[in-house]
Protein backbone atom coordinates (compact mmCIF):
# COMPACT_ATOMS: atom_id res chain seq x y z
CA UNK A 1 0.00 0.00 0.00
CA UNK A 2 2.99 2.30 0.47
CA UNK A 3 3.17 3.28 -3.18
CA UNK A 4 -0.53 3.78 -3.82
CA UNK A 5 -1.47 7.13 -5.22
CA UNK A 6 -4.52 9.29 -4.80
CA UNK A 7 -7.08 10.02 -7.50
CA UNK A 8 -8.98 13.17 -8.25
CA UNK A 9 -6.29 14.74 -10.40
CA UNK A 10 -6.77 16.77 -13.52
CA UNK A 11 -4.87 16.34 -16.79
CA UNK A 12 -1.32 17.57 -16.52
CA UNK A 13 -0.64 21.27 -17.04
CA UNK A 14 -4.30 22.11 -16.38
CA UNK A 15 -4.53 25.58 -14.85
CA UNK A 16 -7.11 27.68 -13.04
CA UNK A 17 -7.66 30.99 -14.78
CA UNK A 18 -9.50 32.61 -11.89
CA UNK A 19 -7.96 35.80 -10.43
CA UNK A 20 -4.76 35.55 -12.37
CA UNK A 21 -3.89 32.05 -11.21
CA UNK A 22 -3.25 30.83 -14.73
CA UNK A 23 0.03 32.65 -15.12
CA UNK A 24 1.39 31.32 -11.85
CA UNK A 25 0.20 27.81 -12.65
CA UNK A 26 1.63 27.87 -16.16
CA UNK A 27 4.97 28.96 -14.78
CA UNK A 28 5.23 25.73 -12.82
CA UNK A 29 6.00 23.78 -15.95
CA UNK A 30 9.71 24.51 -15.63
CA UNK A 31 9.86 23.10 -12.13
CA UNK A 32 6.95 20.69 -11.92
CA UNK A 33 7.08 16.94 -12.18
CA UNK A 34 4.61 15.33 -14.56
CA UNK A 35 3.25 11.85 -15.05
CA UNK A 36 0.06 10.38 -16.37
CA UNK A 37 -1.90 8.43 -13.74
CA UNK A 38 -4.24 9.68 -11.04
CA UNK A 39 -3.19 9.43 -7.44
CA UNK A 40 -5.68 7.60 -5.23
CA UNK A 41 -5.14 3.98 -4.31
CA UNK A 42 -6.95 1.71 -6.76
CA UNK A 43 -9.15 -0.73 -4.86
CA UNK A 44 -11.54 -3.24 -6.32
CA UNK A 45 -11.48 -5.91 -9.02
CA UNK A 46 -13.70 -8.55 -7.42
CA UNK A 47 -13.18 -7.22 -3.89
CA UNK A 48 -9.42 -7.71 -3.99
CA UNK A 49 -7.13 -4.75 -3.26
CA UNK A 50 -4.91 -3.75 -6.16
CA UNK A 51 -1.97 -1.46 -5.44
CA UNK A 52 -0.87 0.59 -8.40
CA UNK A 53 2.85 -0.08 -8.21
CA UNK A 54 4.09 1.30 -11.50
CA UNK A 55 3.36 4.18 -13.79
CA UNK A 56 4.04 4.86 -17.41
CA UNK A 57 6.88 7.32 -17.85
CA UNK A 58 7.89 8.04 -21.41
CA UNK A 59 6.37 4.71 -22.43
CA UNK A 60 8.38 2.80 -19.84
CA UNK A 61 6.99 1.40 -16.60
CA UNK A 62 8.70 2.97 -13.62
CA UNK A 63 8.15 1.35 -10.26
CA UNK A 64 7.31 3.63 -7.36
CA UNK A 65 9.57 2.91 -4.42
CA UNK A 66 9.44 4.14 -0.85
CA UNK A 67 13.00 3.60 0.26
CA UNK A 68 15.66 6.28 0.60
CA UNK A 69 17.05 5.30 -2.81
CA UNK A 70 14.17 6.65 -4.88
CA UNK A 71 12.20 9.86 -5.27
CA UNK A 72 8.47 9.15 -5.47
CA UNK A 73 7.25 9.74 -8.99
CA UNK A 74 4.75 12.55 -9.32
CA UNK A 75 1.16 11.48 -9.61
CA UNK A 76 -0.14 14.46 -11.56
CA UNK A 77 1.01 17.32 -13.74
CA UNK A 78 0.66 19.90 -10.98
CA UNK A 79 3.13 18.26 -8.61
CA UNK A 80 6.14 20.46 -7.92
CA UNK A 81 9.67 19.09 -8.04
CA UNK A 82 11.02 18.40 -4.56
CA UNK A 83 14.72 17.88 -5.28
CA UNK A 84 16.94 20.71 -6.49
CA UNK A 85 19.61 23.26 -5.57
CA UNK A 86 17.09 25.50 -3.79
CA UNK A 87 14.04 24.59 -1.75
CA UNK A 88 10.73 25.01 -3.54
CA UNK A 89 8.35 27.53 -2.00
CA UNK A 90 10.72 30.49 -2.28
CA UNK A 91 11.19 31.56 -5.90
CA UNK A 92 8.72 29.05 -7.34
CA UNK A 93 5.25 30.35 -8.35
CA UNK A 94 3.15 31.31 -5.35
CA UNK A 95 0.16 29.11 -4.55
CA UNK A 96 -3.19 30.29 -3.21
CA UNK A 97 -3.10 28.85 0.33
CA UNK A 98 -0.67 28.58 3.23
CA UNK A 99 -0.22 26.62 6.42
CA UNK A 100 2.89 27.82 8.23
CA UNK A 101 4.05 26.07 11.38
CA UNK A 102 6.85 26.83 13.83
CA UNK A 103 8.06 23.97 16.01
CA UNK A 104 9.86 23.70 19.33
CA UNK A 105 12.32 20.82 19.56
CA UNK A 106 11.40 19.00 22.77
CA UNK A 107 14.08 16.32 22.69
CA UNK A 108 17.71 16.89 23.62
CA UNK A 109 18.81 13.77 21.75
CA UNK A 110 20.73 14.76 18.62
CA UNK A 111 20.25 11.37 16.96
CA UNK A 112 16.50 11.48 17.60
CA UNK A 113 16.25 14.93 16.02
CA UNK A 114 18.22 13.80 12.98
CA UNK A 115 15.85 10.86 12.58
CA UNK A 116 12.87 13.21 12.64
CA UNK A 117 14.42 15.39 9.95
CA UNK A 118 15.16 12.35 7.81
CA UNK A 119 11.59 11.08 8.19
CA UNK A 120 10.21 14.55 7.51
CA UNK A 121 12.20 14.79 4.30
CA UNK A 122 11.03 11.39 3.08
CA UNK A 123 7.42 12.29 3.88
CA UNK A 124 7.74 15.70 2.22
CA UNK A 125 9.08 14.12 -0.97
CA UNK A 126 6.07 11.80 -1.10
CA UNK A 127 3.43 14.40 -0.23
CA UNK A 128 4.68 16.97 -2.73
CA UNK A 129 4.57 14.25 -5.39
CA UNK A 130 0.95 13.52 -4.46
CA UNK A 131 1.48 10.30 -2.52
CA UNK A 132 0.43 9.18 0.92
CA UNK A 133 2.95 9.07 3.74
CA UNK A 134 4.55 5.71 4.50
CA UNK A 135 2.17 2.78 4.08
CA UNK A 136 -0.73 5.16 3.53
CA UNK A 137 -4.02 6.11 5.14
CA UNK A 138 -5.39 2.57 5.00
CA UNK A 139 -2.20 0.75 5.90
CA UNK A 140 -1.43 -2.90 5.83
CA UNK A 141 -2.33 -3.50 9.50
CA UNK A 142 -5.71 -2.21 10.61
CA UNK A 143 -4.77 -2.83 14.25
CA UNK A 144 -2.22 0.00 14.11
CA UNK A 145 -2.63 3.72 13.46
CA UNK A 146 -2.15 4.43 9.75
CA UNK A 147 0.98 6.23 8.56
CA UNK A 148 -1.10 8.88 6.77
CA UNK A 149 -3.99 10.81 8.30
CA UNK A 150 -6.02 10.48 5.10
CA UNK A 151 -7.70 13.86 4.65
CA UNK A 152 -5.90 14.41 1.33
CA UNK A 153 -7.19 11.19 -0.24
CA UNK A 154 -8.84 12.05 -3.53
CA UNK A 155 -7.21 15.46 -3.77
CA UNK A 156 -4.75 16.47 -6.45
CA UNK A 157 -1.20 17.58 -5.50
CA UNK A 158 -2.22 21.25 -5.79
CA UNK A 159 1.38 22.37 -6.39
CA UNK A 160 2.24 21.60 -2.77
CA UNK A 161 5.63 22.87 -1.65
CA UNK A 162 7.20 22.32 1.76
CA UNK A 163 9.95 24.73 2.81
CA UNK A 164 12.03 23.95 5.90
CA UNK A 165 13.97 26.31 8.15
CA UNK A 166 15.86 26.39 11.44
CA UNK A 167 15.58 29.10 14.07
CA UNK A 168 18.08 30.55 16.53
CA UNK A 169 16.83 28.26 19.31
CA UNK A 170 18.18 25.19 17.53
CA UNK A 171 21.72 26.48 18.01
CA UNK A 172 21.39 27.66 21.60
CA UNK A 173 18.42 27.84 23.93
CA UNK A 174 18.37 29.02 27.53
CA UNK A 175 22.15 29.05 27.42
CA UNK A 176 22.36 25.40 26.36
CA UNK A 177 23.97 24.01 23.22
CA UNK A 178 21.61 21.04 23.05
CA UNK A 179 22.82 19.56 19.77
CA UNK A 180 26.41 20.75 19.46
CA UNK A 181 25.41 23.30 16.83
CA UNK A 182 26.25 26.60 18.54
CA UNK A 183 29.39 27.14 16.48
CA UNK A 184 27.43 26.42 13.29
CA UNK A 185 25.00 29.32 13.69
CA UNK A 186 25.31 31.67 10.71
CA UNK A 187 26.15 35.27 11.53
CA UNK A 188 23.18 36.36 9.44
CA UNK A 189 20.76 34.41 11.67
CA UNK A 190 20.47 37.29 14.10
CA UNK A 191 17.85 37.85 16.76
CA UNK A 192 15.58 40.46 15.25
CA UNK A 193 15.65 43.77 17.12
CA UNK A 194 12.56 45.32 18.61
CA UNK A 195 10.95 47.77 16.21
CA UNK A 196 8.86 50.82 17.17
CA UNK A 197 5.22 49.85 17.52
CA UNK A 198 5.81 46.13 17.96
CA UNK A 199 3.35 44.37 20.26
CA UNK A 200 4.64 40.84 19.89
CA UNK A 201 2.90 37.84 21.40
CA UNK A 202 5.56 35.36 22.55
CA UNK A 203 3.13 32.52 21.89
CA UNK A 204 3.02 33.54 18.22
CA UNK A 205 6.73 34.24 17.81
CA UNK A 206 10.00 32.35 17.46
CA UNK A 207 10.53 28.65 16.95
CA UNK A 208 13.38 26.15 16.64
CA UNK A 209 12.17 24.83 13.28
CA UNK A 210 9.62 25.89 10.70
CA UNK A 211 7.80 24.38 7.76
CA UNK A 212 6.00 26.53 5.22
CA UNK A 213 3.36 24.51 3.38
CA UNK A 214 1.89 26.20 0.31
CA UNK A 215 -0.72 24.67 -1.99
CA UNK A 216 -3.69 25.67 -4.10
CA UNK A 217 -5.97 23.52 -1.91
CA UNK A 218 -5.93 24.44 1.81
CA UNK A 219 -6.66 20.85 2.84
CA UNK A 220 -3.51 19.66 1.08
CA UNK A 221 -1.42 22.22 2.97
CA UNK A 222 -3.02 21.37 6.31
CA UNK A 223 -2.59 17.66 5.64
CA UNK A 224 1.14 18.18 5.10
CA UNK A 225 1.73 20.04 8.37
CA UNK A 226 -0.49 17.64 10.30
CA UNK A 227 1.47 14.63 9.11
CA UNK A 228 4.85 16.19 9.83
CA UNK A 229 3.66 17.05 13.34
CA UNK A 230 2.48 13.46 13.79
CA UNK A 231 5.83 12.08 12.64
CA UNK A 232 7.68 14.33 15.07
CA UNK A 233 5.43 13.69 18.06
CA UNK A 234 7.46 13.36 21.25
CA UNK A 235 10.49 14.99 19.64
CA UNK A 236 9.05 18.25 18.32
CA UNK A 237 5.83 20.15 19.03
CA UNK A 238 4.05 22.91 17.16
CA UNK A 239 4.73 26.22 18.88
CA UNK A 240 2.38 28.23 16.69
CA UNK A 241 0.88 28.03 13.23
CA UNK A 242 -0.88 30.28 10.77
CA UNK A 243 -3.33 29.62 7.97
CA UNK A 244 -3.26 32.01 5.04
CA UNK A 245 -5.24 32.67 1.88
CA UNK A 246 -5.19 35.10 -1.02
CA UNK A 247 -1.46 35.28 -1.71
CA UNK A 248 -0.40 38.92 -1.39
CA UNK A 249 2.67 38.74 -3.62
CA UNK A 250 3.54 36.87 -6.77
CA UNK A 251 6.88 35.67 -8.08
CA UNK A 252 5.40 35.50 -11.58
CA UNK A 253 5.49 38.97 -13.21
CA UNK A 254 2.70 38.34 -15.72
CA UNK A 255 0.27 37.15 -13.06
CA UNK A 256 -2.42 39.51 -11.83
CA UNK A 257 -1.13 41.29 -8.72
CA UNK A 258 -3.09 40.10 -5.66
CA UNK A 259 -4.84 42.46 -3.24
CA UNK A 260 -4.42 42.56 0.51
CA UNK A 261 -7.16 42.90 3.13
CA UNK A 262 -7.03 46.68 2.75
CA UNK A 263 -8.07 46.33 -0.87
CA UNK A 264 -4.79 47.44 -2.43
CA UNK A 265 -2.60 45.50 -4.82
CA UNK A 266 0.32 44.03 -2.91
CA UNK A 267 3.60 42.88 -4.41
CA UNK A 268 3.74 44.86 -7.66
CA UNK A 269 7.52 45.19 -7.61
CA UNK A 270 8.34 41.78 -6.14
CA UNK A 271 11.41 39.86 -7.29
CA UNK A 272 10.58 37.58 -10.19
CA UNK A 273 11.17 33.89 -9.72
CA UNK A 274 12.76 33.80 -13.16
CA UNK A 275 15.16 36.72 -12.59
CA UNK A 276 18.22 34.68 -11.71
CA UNK A 277 20.48 37.72 -11.37
CA UNK A 278 18.15 39.35 -8.83
CA UNK A 279 17.72 36.09 -6.94
CA UNK A 280 21.48 35.59 -6.72
CA UNK A 281 21.97 39.17 -5.56
CA UNK A 282 19.14 39.47 -3.06
CA UNK A 283 17.80 36.01 -2.10
CA UNK A 284 20.27 33.12 -2.33
CA UNK A 285 23.12 32.81 0.15
CA UNK A 286 26.47 32.54 -1.63
CA UNK A 287 29.57 30.62 -0.62
CA UNK A 288 31.38 33.82 0.31
CA UNK A 289 28.66 34.72 2.84
CA UNK A 290 30.09 32.20 5.32
CA UNK A 291 28.31 29.21 6.89
CA UNK A 292 28.94 26.84 4.00
CA UNK A 293 25.97 24.66 4.88
CA UNK A 294 23.71 27.62 3.96
CA UNK A 295 25.06 28.10 0.43
CA UNK A 296 22.05 28.09 -1.88
CA UNK A 297 19.69 28.77 0.99
CA UNK A 298 17.99 31.95 2.19
CA UNK A 299 16.79 33.70 5.34
CA UNK A 300 13.09 33.84 6.14
CA UNK A 301 11.39 36.49 8.24
CA UNK A 302 7.76 35.93 9.22
CA UNK A 303 5.65 38.70 10.75
CA UNK A 304 2.02 38.46 11.75
CA UNK A 305 0.63 41.92 11.01
CA UNK A 306 -2.83 42.64 12.33
CA UNK A 307 -4.81 45.29 10.50
CA UNK A 308 -7.21 47.61 12.28
CA UNK A 309 -9.85 46.78 9.73
CA UNK A 310 -12.75 48.72 11.25
CA UNK A 311 -10.70 51.94 11.44
CA UNK A 312 -9.40 51.48 7.91
CA UNK A 313 -12.90 50.93 6.56
CA UNK A 314 -13.91 54.37 7.89
CA UNK A 315 -10.99 56.12 6.20
CA UNK A 316 -11.62 58.16 3.05
CA UNK A 317 -10.46 56.77 -0.27
CA UNK A 318 -8.18 59.75 -0.85
CA UNK A 319 -6.44 59.23 2.47
CA UNK A 320 -6.09 55.51 1.80
CA UNK A 321 -4.43 56.23 -1.54
CA UNK A 322 -2.15 58.85 -0.01
CA UNK A 323 -1.06 56.38 2.66
CA UNK A 324 -0.11 53.74 0.11
CA UNK A 325 1.13 56.06 -2.63
CA UNK A 326 -0.90 54.22 -5.26
CA UNK A 327 -4.45 54.46 -6.55
CA UNK A 328 -6.76 51.71 -5.35
CA UNK A 329 -8.35 50.70 -8.66
CA UNK A 330 -5.34 50.24 -10.95
CA UNK A 331 -2.50 50.25 -8.44
CA UNK A 332 -0.72 53.01 -10.35
CA UNK A 333 1.82 55.10 -8.45
CA UNK A 334 0.96 58.73 -7.74
CA UNK A 335 0.86 60.71 -10.97
CA UNK A 336 1.02 57.60 -13.18
CA UNK A 337 -1.58 55.64 -15.15
CA UNK A 338 -0.54 52.00 -14.93
CA UNK A 339 0.36 49.73 -12.04
CA UNK A 340 3.84 48.92 -13.32
CA UNK A 341 4.79 52.46 -14.30
CA UNK A 342 8.00 53.55 -12.61
CA UNK A 343 7.08 55.43 -9.41
CA UNK A 344 8.27 58.98 -8.83
CA UNK A 345 8.96 58.85 -5.11
CA UNK A 346 9.09 62.62 -4.65
CA UNK A 347 5.54 62.87 -6.02
CA UNK A 348 4.31 60.81 -3.05
CA UNK A 349 3.82 62.03 0.49
CA UNK A 350 7.01 61.59 2.57
CA UNK A 351 5.31 59.05 4.84
CA UNK A 352 3.62 57.00 2.12
CA UNK A 353 4.17 53.26 2.31
CA UNK A 354 5.41 52.73 -1.25
CA UNK A 355 7.92 55.56 -0.98
CA UNK A 356 9.34 54.33 2.32
CA UNK A 357 9.45 50.67 1.24
CA UNK A 358 11.20 51.36 -2.07
CA UNK A 359 14.83 50.16 -2.33
CA UNK A 360 15.91 53.73 -3.16
CA UNK A 361 14.72 54.76 0.32
CA UNK A 362 16.59 51.92 2.01
CA UNK A 363 20.09 51.88 0.50
CA UNK A 364 18.98 49.27 -2.02
CA UNK A 365 17.49 46.83 0.51
CA UNK A 366 15.40 44.32 -1.46
CA UNK A 367 13.38 41.32 -0.32
CA UNK A 368 11.34 38.60 -1.98
CA UNK A 369 7.84 38.74 -0.52
CA UNK A 370 5.63 35.68 -0.25
CA UNK A 371 2.92 36.70 2.20
CA UNK A 372 -0.73 35.77 2.66
CA UNK A 373 -3.85 37.35 4.09
CA UNK A 374 -5.42 35.85 7.19
CA UNK A 375 -8.61 36.06 9.22
CA UNK A 376 -8.79 34.40 12.62
CA UNK A 377 -12.27 35.24 13.85
CA UNK A 378 -12.82 38.20 16.16
CA UNK A 379 -11.33 39.47 19.39
CA UNK A 380 -13.14 40.05 22.69
CA UNK A 381 -14.45 43.38 21.43
CA UNK A 382 -15.92 41.91 18.28
CA UNK A 383 -13.22 43.34 16.03
CA UNK A 384 -12.03 41.26 13.10
CA UNK A 385 -8.69 39.58 13.75
CA UNK A 386 -7.37 39.88 10.22
CA UNK A 387 -4.35 41.11 8.37
CA UNK A 388 -1.20 40.08 6.59
CA UNK A 389 1.03 37.13 7.39
CA UNK A 390 4.16 38.68 5.95
CA UNK A 391 6.88 36.33 4.70
CA UNK A 392 10.13 37.65 3.24
CA UNK A 393 13.17 35.84 1.90
CA UNK A 394 16.56 37.48 1.60
CA UNK A 395 20.26 36.79 1.40
CA UNK A 396 21.00 38.63 4.67
CA UNK A 397 18.40 40.18 6.98
CA UNK A 398 20.96 42.70 8.22
CA UNK A 399 21.03 44.29 4.77
CA UNK A 400 17.39 43.75 3.87
CA UNK A 401 14.49 43.28 6.28
CA UNK A 402 16.04 44.99 9.32
CA UNK A 403 16.84 48.36 7.69
CA UNK A 404 13.61 48.22 5.68
CA UNK A 405 11.41 47.54 8.70
CA UNK A 406 13.28 50.08 10.81
CA UNK A 407 12.44 52.78 8.28
CA UNK A 408 8.82 51.70 7.98
CA UNK A 409 8.29 51.34 11.73
CA UNK A 410 9.54 54.86 12.35
CA UNK A 411 7.90 56.74 9.51
CA UNK A 412 5.13 54.84 7.67
CA UNK A 413 1.68 56.45 7.73
CA UNK A 414 0.26 52.93 7.51
CA UNK A 415 1.35 52.26 11.09
CA UNK A 416 -1.83 53.92 12.35
CA UNK A 417 -3.78 51.01 10.86
CA UNK A 418 -1.53 48.00 11.55
CA UNK A 419 0.38 46.35 14.37
CA UNK A 420 3.03 43.64 14.29
CA UNK A 421 1.94 40.98 16.79
CA UNK A 422 4.09 37.97 15.83
CA UNK A 423 7.65 37.57 14.60
CA UNK A 424 10.18 34.88 13.72
CA UNK A 425 13.39 34.39 11.77
CA UNK A 426 14.70 31.17 10.25
CA UNK A 427 17.68 30.04 8.21
CA UNK A 428 16.36 28.10 5.22
CA UNK A 429 18.97 25.60 3.98
CA UNK A 430 19.52 24.86 0.29
CA UNK A 431 17.38 22.30 -1.47
CA UNK A 432 17.49 18.55 -0.98
CA UNK A 433 19.78 17.37 -3.77
CA UNK A 434 18.73 13.73 -4.08
CA UNK A 435 17.20 10.80 -2.22
CA UNK A 436 20.30 10.41 -0.06
CA UNK A 437 20.02 13.98 1.20
CA UNK A 438 17.69 15.33 3.89
CA UNK A 439 16.66 18.62 5.46
CA UNK A 440 19.59 19.94 7.50
CA UNK A 441 22.06 17.19 6.59
CA UNK A 442 24.92 19.62 5.89
CA UNK A 443 24.23 21.43 9.17
CA UNK A 444 24.63 18.24 11.20
CA UNK A 445 27.65 16.99 9.22
Role assignments for model-derived ranges:
Residues 3, 41-62, 66-445:
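Long, histidine/aromatic-enriched segments associated with O2/redox biology
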Amino acid sequence: MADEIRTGTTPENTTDTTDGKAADATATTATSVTSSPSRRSVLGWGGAGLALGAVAAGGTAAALRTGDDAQPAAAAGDAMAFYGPHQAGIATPVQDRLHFAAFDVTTSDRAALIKVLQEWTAAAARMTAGHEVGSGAVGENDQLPPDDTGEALGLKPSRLTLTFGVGPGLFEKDGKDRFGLKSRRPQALVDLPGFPGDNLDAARSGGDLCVQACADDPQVAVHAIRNLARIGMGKVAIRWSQLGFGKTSSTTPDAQTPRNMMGFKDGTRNISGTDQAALDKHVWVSEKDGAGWMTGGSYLVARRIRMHIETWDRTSLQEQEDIFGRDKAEGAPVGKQKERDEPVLKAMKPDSHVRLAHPDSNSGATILRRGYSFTDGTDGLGRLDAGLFFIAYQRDVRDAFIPLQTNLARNDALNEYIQHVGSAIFAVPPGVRDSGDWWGKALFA
